[in-house]
Structure formats: structure tokens, C-alpha cells
A protein has these predicted regions:
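Bacterial Sec-dependent N-terminal signal peptides
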Residues: 1-27
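Sequence signature of WD/YWTD-type beta-propeller architectures
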Residues: 22-488
């Protein structure tokens, strides 16, 4: 057995797991807790429609603080260790500064007479971001999966609501809400346990589906919806969690078996392509290409686990998909070779314009959130060139991500800072693939992230609000039988 891993399966853990323009600021990533402001909004690029960047100063012993924010003739002055904007005032400032930079200047007087002066800028991009973000709020523990909720936030302001929660689902575990190409009318998520199912939001209707069968190794786990809305591609996984005894590592998760399946939502059918269900290969994390003509997924050779866990490395694969017949091709190709890069890939996501694919790279394995070395990587699908993303990545886990509908922004979950709590960060991508220093989701309360003891899990962008809420989902859990799917 691999030294350092306890091969101990804990049921509660299992439920948790399944269940470059002129003037633009590219900046540098910093995880230094001694930064003068928090959140770190210094020298970032933001969309013109983002909510106010409220923040506070981090110095000890502040006696007096003044912040001056200016753009041309517009000047705004804030006194005190917090800078909290009125929404309309902020929106007017962003609209006037679109395509240019806003200047920030602060003077801090500390106990003992010391004075600190700080200056920085925020660049305002004219590329709007999709106005809604969904995420799962969950405690970052191993055995805690109760009181889980999926929330939807308008990121143009601070309005937020639950679209599924523990209170309406008998404290069920639920898995994260994903959209197809950031479409509010095409999304899905799971409610696990008794009376649960996959909830498919398509064309104004929400359906409750049973995406499982005795012939499959498990119910569906990870996946994505085809751009047409007719199909879904999913993995079926036997997931094993184990604890490290090494002090610098916490939890290791791996699959002992995993295959891919195609769901036909029109015919209520599941298809298992033989080429994507080999016993000697572990296949997982499937997604569709932007045009729906291909499937990208991660694959690794089967091996003895957990003994060989540090040898388990996944490559990024591609196979054709016939969207008329709902069938895959027979000749998968390697897009990113794990042996060549000496790493392991997971969470691929294609940009809606078809130009980029972003994915997470770890040293090994397939469950990266407790791997501090995890970083985001992006490939140009037209040229095969890998983009340098040093400005985005940190010294903590940077993992799940999703694209905006115009392919100009992406959001990702990062544990930068304390290494425990995931927060949603945003970055801009220009036509050449150049990315900007990320900024965390703004909050009305500038102290919220220090006080919040839950992770923002699987952040996913959307071009509008979904047409359901926690109460309607709860009613479906209680009263609606899940539609059965037959394996063909």
C-alpha cells in the first residue's frame, strides 16, 4: 500500500464527493497576507458591469485613513479603514472609465505617527461579463455534507438567492450547478439520496432524471450538456477517498473504475461507447467542444490503487461525436500527454468560441482541490500552443473554472490565502490568450471572506437567472418521480 495513505473509506466523505489592450493591467498574483488592502483589487482588470470593489485596509493600529478615487474630473473620497461604494455611484464611474484606468490613492496614519501612502489602478474593460454566477456553498470538511446549498448571485450587484438548498430537500447532498456555454436556459445539477435525481433545466422546463442503471458501474457523476441541449456526456465513477498521514497533505481521492456514457434527453436513453468504457483505462471529466462535434475527456491507465497513486496521471483526450446519431468516433487522440508533461490533467472546459480549452494540472491523480500544486493551463485549440498563465496561478489550489458566453472572461475556484476555503476569482482573456491578474468576487461586506467558513464550490457563469428556485426544486424532490433512462 502507498505509504502515507490510509485506505479507509468513509461514507460521509463519499457523499460529499459524488454528491492585450492598451492600458490594461496584467499585474502579478500575490498571496501575501500583508497586502495593504483586502480583498486584493490592486492593479486588476474588471468588466464594466461588475459590482463595487469594496475593500478594507489590513494595517494594525490604524488611526486615520483617507482614500481618493479619481477618473478625469470625477473624484470620490472615503474616510475610514473601509471603502464601501454606493451602487449607482460605482456604476457611473465604471461607465465613464470604460477602456481606461481608475486611480486609487490612500494615506494611512498609524499609531506611533507612522504614515503609509499607497497608489494603484483598476483597469475597466469594455468586455462585459455574464451577469450571473452559481456556486455551491459547503463547509470544507471531509465528513460534513449537511446544510449544503446552491446559490445564484447577480455579479452586477449583490443580489443572491438559493436555487437549491438543504432546507427544501431533507438535508440532502447536492452536486454543483453547471450551464452549457453559460446559458441560463440550459443547465443541470444533482440532488443525491432518497427521492433525488439529476435536474435538467432545458427550454424553460425542469425535468427530474434517473441517470443510472444496474449495468453501469455507478450513476452519472461528472459531465456536461451538448450545445444543442439534446445530449449529455457523463462519467460513471467508483470514487474512493483516503486520508494522508503526511502532515503537508490532507485528502487523496481516486477512481478504481470509471467509464463514459452518452445521455439522449429526447429518447431517455443511455449509450455506453465501448471505446470510452475500457477496463484497462480510467476515463473521466468529459466535456463537449464548442461546436458539439467532439468530446474532450481525461484518461489514465488502470493501476493498483492506492499503492500507485503517485503514478496515476491523466492525459487530455479527444474523440469525435456525431450529433445526429448521438454516437462517438472510434479513434481517440491525445491532446495533452501526461507522460510528456509529467503531470495529470482534469476539469477541461472549452471556450464557447471554440478557440481555447482550459484545464487543471496536478502532479498526479484526478481530484485536485487538496493539491496545493494545482494550476490552471490553457491551450489554443487551433495551434496546440499552451498559454502562460503564471499571472493567474498561485501557490495554492487553483481548480474548477467556467467560461463567459463571449469567451472573454473565466471564473475559477482558488484556495489562495489560507489554503482551506475556495473563493471565486475572475480573469480576462484577450484575443491572443493573454490573461490578467485575477480578482475575487466582490462582496457588499468587505470582511465577508474573513468571516465566512464555507467554500464557494464550482463557480459557473450564466447569461441570466435560471427559471427555478429552492422551493420549486424541493417540491420536485418530494412529489415528482425521476424519469428512467434505458441503456441501449
Amino acid at each position: 500500500m502507498q505509504k502515507g495513505i490510509l485506505n479507509k473509506v468513509i461514507a460521509a466523505v463519499f457523499l460529499l464527493l459524488v454528491c492585450a489592450s492598451c492600458g490594461r493591467k496584467y499585474g502579478e498574483v500575490s498571496t501575501n497576507s500583508a497586502l495593504p488592502i483586502y480583498p486584493d483589487y490592486m492593479d486588476v482588470t474588471v468588466p464594466v458591469n461588475i459590482a463595487p470593489l469594496n475593500f478594507h485596509y489590513t494595517y494594525d493600529g490604524i488611526r486615520k485613513a483617507r482614500t481618493v478615487v479619481s477618473y478625469k474630473d470625477a473624484v470620490h473620497t472615503f474616510d475610514g479603514k473601509e471603502v464601501v461604494w454606493e451602487l449607482q455611484q460605482w456604476k457611473q464611474l465604471l461607465a465613464s472609465a470604460q477602456g481606461d484606468s481608475i486611480s486609487f490613492s490612500s494615506e494611512i496614519r498609524l499609531k506611533g505617527g507612522k504614515k503609509e501612502t499607497i497608489e494603484w489602478e483598476v483597469y475597466v474593460s469594455g468586455d462585459k461579463i455574464d451577469p450571473y454566477l452559481s456556486y455551491r456553498l459547503i463547509e470544507p470538511g471531509y465528513e460534513v455534507w449537511h446544510e449544503v446549498e446552491i446559490r445564484e448571485r447577480c455579479i452586477e450587484n449583490f443580489e443572491e438567492r438559493a436555487i437549491s438548498d438543504w432546507k427544501n430537500t431533507n438535508n440532502s447532498c447536492m452536486n454543483c450547478h453547471i450551464h452549457s456555454q453559460a446559458r441560463a436556459d440550459l443547465s443541470m445539477f444533482y440532488v443525491r439520496g432518497k427521492n433525488g435525481g439529476a435536474f435538467l433545466n432545458r427550454n424553460g422546463e425542469v425535468r427530474k432524471l434517473a441517470l443510472n442503471d444496474k449495468s453501469l458501474i455507478s450513476g452519472t457523476v461528472y459531465g456536461e450538456i451538448h450545445p444543442s441541449g439534446r445530449y449529455g456526456v457523463f462519467s460513471t465513477n467508483i470514487i474512493i477517498p483516503g486520508f494522508h498521514t503526511q502532515v503537508n497533505k490532507r485528502l487523496e481521492v481516486y477512481d478504481t473504475r470509471s467509464d463514459l456514457v452518452i445521455a439522449d434527453f429526447d429518447r431517455n436513453e443511455l449509450k455506453v461507447p465501448e471505446i470510452l468504457a475500457r477496463k484497462d483505462v480510467l476515463e473521466t471529466f468529459p466535456v463537449f467542444s464548442a461546436d458539439g462535434n467532439s468530446i474532450y475527456y481525461c484518461a489514465a491507465d488502470s493501476m493498483t490503487l492506492p499503492r500507485d497513486i503517485e503514478k496515476l496521471r491523466y492525459s487530455l483526450m479527444k474523440v469525435g461525436f456525431d450529433k445526429e446519431a448521438g454516437r462517438t468516433g472510434q479513434n481517440p487522440e491525445v491532446i495533452w500527454d501526461a507522460s510528456e508533461h509529467n503531470g495529470s490533467v482534469c476539469h477541461p472546459k472549452c471556450s464557447p468560441d471554440g478557440k481555447w480549452i482550459m484545464y487543471t494540472v496536478a502532479d498526479y491523480g484526478t481530484f485536485p482541490i487538496w493539491h496545493s500544486e494545482c494550476q490552471l493551463e490553457m491551450m489554443n485549440l487551433h495551434t496546440g500552443e499552451i498559454v502562460n498563465m503564471d499571472v493567474v496561478n498561485s501557490d495554492r489550489s487553483d481548480t474548477y473554472h467556467s467560461w463567459s458566453s463571449d469567451s472573454r472572461w473565466f471564473v475559477f475556484a482558488s484556495k489562495r490565502g489560507d489554503g482551506k476555503y475556495g473563493r471565486p476569482y475572475f480573469s480576462h482573456v484577450d484575443e491572443n490568450g493573454r490573461v490578467t491578474k485575477p480578482f475575487v468576487l466582490p462582496q457588499e461586506d468587505p470582511w465577508l471572506y474573513e468571516d465566512c467558513l464555507r467554500s464557494f464550490n464550482i463557480p459557473d457563469l450564466s447569461n441570466g437567472p435560471v427559471n427555478f428556485d429552492a422551493e420549486s426544486i424541493g417540491q420536485m424532490v418530494r412529489e415528482v418521480e425521476a424519469a428512467r433512462f434505458a441503456v441501449k
